[in-house]
């Protein structure tokens, strides 16, 4: 049986690879690549899959190898790349992760509303690129609830 991983999706520059590095406990530098990366505990998907609506079917197919989806939202971005209700396309739990929220130009309240519009309920956490404690606690709680 295949080991289920965490699917990480988000716009360009939102911190997908950095987050994957923390979850996988990888001490190496973050590398920029154009391919889907299957790591020990994550599936890191390039932003091109999200930027092109005709690639959505590939995101949904990749979710078959995952036990949950992390949808990243950049607090600096003015617009969301996610379609309304996009999270509902997945049959596995979806967690919204708001990144870059401590920067001057960030607007976490606006981005939280984008999370709600994308179909993510209460499952929203913040990640600043340095401390993944809150996110790891959320993932562990979700694992316990799902019996994974």
Residue ranges and their predicted role:
Residues 11, 46, 73-76, 100-101, ...:
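Structural motif
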Residues 43-88, 105:
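Switch II of P-loop NTPase G domains
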């Amino acid at each position: 049986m295949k080991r289920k991983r965490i699917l990480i999706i988000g716009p360009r520059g939102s911190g997908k690879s950095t987050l994957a590095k923390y979850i996988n406990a990888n001490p190496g530098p973050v590398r920029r690549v154009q391919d889907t990366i299957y790591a020990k505990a994550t599936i890191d998907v390039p932003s091109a899959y999200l930027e092109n609506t005709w690639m959505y079917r590939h995101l949904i197919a990749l979710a078959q190898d995952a036990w949950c989806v992390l949808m990243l939202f950049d607090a600096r971005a003015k617009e969301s790349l996610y379609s309304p209700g996009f999270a509902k396309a997945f049959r596995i739990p979806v967690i919204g992760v708001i990144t870059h929220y401590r920067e001057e130009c960030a607007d976490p309240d606006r981005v939280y509303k984008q999370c709600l519009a994308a179909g993510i309920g209460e499952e929203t956490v913040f990640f600043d690129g340095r401390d993944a404690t809150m996110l790891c606690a959320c993932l562990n709680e979700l694992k316990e609830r799902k019996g994974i």
